[in-house]
Amino acid sequence: DMNRNITNIPEGLANDQRFEFHHRYMLGLYRVLAHLTKRFPDILFESCAGGGGRNDLGIMYYMPQAWASDDTDAIERLSIQEGTSLIYPPSSIGAHVSAVPNHQVGRITPLATRGNVAMMGGAFGYELDLTKLSEKELDEISQQIETYHSIRETIQFGQLYRLKKTTNTWAANYVSQDKNQAVFTFIKILAKPEAPLLHVRLKGLDPDALYECPQLGETFYGDELMNIGLIMPHVQKDYFSVQYIFNKI
């Protein structure tokens, strides 16, 4: 992660080789990374799409995880992670919960929403000072980590379905490869007066299977969730989110 461009091209190349500099630089970088990853095969090296500007398929051969952006605001991250997921698998996208007010935009979002957005990003984690959090927040983080452990394989290696996106809402669900689990997340950015109820249909489930959702305390058939769908909670608060996990019975 180096937060600057290469501006001073060395004088070591002949004039007719100056245009080869950046290509030669990349070959040298790959040579160094090949040595590091071979020498330390158990270390996960992460590249950076922000300062390093190195989020491409070439670097992924050596660094299979990339920090998607230094912008960690939950609302900003919706578009950042969605755009990144159009090209890269969720297992490669670094997505963390950070402190509020956010260090870049100053926004204050609920810990639950920050967690839900980061979990849907892929490689989930935290970057904040735990000593400054309340006991309630620490308990919530502990629960988030436990939840992510139960859905990590589905998020990182399942199928992602983008369900509903407007200027004010975002919804998506992951389905595990064996269709035994689905993870649904809905985000409402701003509360609106007299807003209509929002209806969302899931995708990718086993239509004949019965799924249990502990968050709702109900069971649903796959075709029911995909054809009838769910009504989103009518909660009047900004930056509201829900996460529903459906496990095949």
Model-found features: residue ranges?
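Hydrophobic, well-ordered secondary-structure elements that form the walls
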Residues: 1, 45, 118, 184, ...
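Active-site-proximal loop/turn and secondary-structure-junction residues that shape catalytic pockets
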Residues: 2-8, 49-53
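Aromatic- and acidic-residue-enriched carbohydrate-binding clefts of CAZyme catalytic domains
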Residues: 4-30
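Glycan-recognition surfaces
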Residues: 23-131
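A glycine-rich phosphate-binding loop feature that marks nucleotide/adenosyl-phosphate handling sites
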Residues: 47-56, 134-138, 161-168
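Catalytic cores of secreted or luminal carbohydrate-active enzymes
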Residues: 112-162
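Carbohydrate-binding surface patches
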Residues: 165-207
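C-terminal beta-sandwich/jelly-roll accessory domains of carbohydrate-active enzymes
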Residues: 190-249
